Every structure is written in C-alpha cells, then in structure tokens.
Amino acid sequence: IIKYDYLSGKAIETIFDVATAKNCTLKKISDYEFDPQEKRILILTDKTPIYRHSFSTTYYVYNITRNELEPLSQNPGVQNLAQFSPNGRMIAFARGNNLFIKKLDFNTELQITKDGEFNKIINGTADWVYEEEFGRTRYFEWSPDSKLLAWVRFDESEIKQFSFDVYDHPYDNAYTYKYPKAGETNSTVSVHVYDIENRTTKQMNCGTGNDIYFPIVQWTNDNESLAIVRL
C-alpha cells in the first residue's frame, strides 16, 4: 500500500509491504481499509463470493506505527463485514451468523450474540432478500461515540428452503438456503442495540406487525437516536 501526493501524483511513502511487515506471511491481499484515525489498516485476503454482493474473507489488522500484522481473530471460522468503530479502538464483525467485537487495546474478542444458526437466525448480516432487493449486506452500525452497536436480527426459521446443484467438483453437490418466493413468508426482523460498557442488549420498539422490512438502520449524529426506515 503506497501513499501518493495528491497534487504531484508522486509516491511519497510505503505504508504496508508484505515483504517487510512483522509477522506477515501473506503473498498478496484482496482489499484494505484504514481506521478513522489512520493508525491501523484492515487487510482482507482470500475473498470468496457468497451471493450477488456478499463475500467471506480472512481479516488481518496492521498496526502502522509498529509495522506489525496480526489476525483479526484467533478463533476458527470465516469472517464477514468487519468494521472499525469511529474511535478506531474496536472492530465489529460477523462470523457464523453471530456478531463479535475485537477490542484492539486489549487484544480481546467479545461475542455479543449467540443464537445465530445457518438457515435459522442471522445477526447483523442481510438475508438473501435484503441483499438482493436492497443491495446491502451489512446490517450493524456503530454509534458515533463507539459506545453502542445496533444491528438487525433476521429470523428465517419459517421460510421455505430451496436447493440447487453446484458443479464445482467431479460430483455435484446440492446447496440449500432460505428463499422466499413471491407471496411466501419473509424473515421476521427486529432491531437490537448492544451497550459495550455495560454488556447489555435491548430490543428496539419498531411497531407492530411481522410482514415488514427495515432496509436502513443508521445512527443519527445524536448518540441516543437511531434512525430506522420501516417498509
């Protein structure tokens, strides 16, 4: 990753190099993202497509000052949608349909949901309908002061399954997922907020009815106000 001068277009600094970074065994990267303070970089490797927009990947965190690379998580399982907190001190990410927070100052990992299960419960990641129709994959958001994390929970337990054959090996295999056809049941959605300091979760009152959508959930500039678009 090379820093360029905007006016001259000349390279002025190498910010990250797989050949010189400490603890780095990578040969190439897929993508990267700076934290808001530009002290750390999220490094993405081995991106694997899932649906139209979504993908799984392996994340690393690069400390620019220390020239040091380390995995985002030491625990098994592919990671999705990692996002720095506004203060740059934490990273929220999804794994196995659950949400986690990595506290970078202490190098600790906190699991904030535990009910995630494939083809049943999804926390913070769009189900197939939301990704396809609204074009979004990440459904969790940090509050501006980095003290709260809001997310959408998708309960797709009552959705009928659909299967198709995948021909990527000598013997094809069937892929089965929840696919609501027109007129059929969609996911039951709810919005939740996790308090980082108190380690408590609250469900937001979003009105009545189950046949609804929450295409956008976003914090306002007020740390106590969460904007929810309901359809």
Predicted regions and their residues:
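Beta-propeller folds
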Residues: 1-231
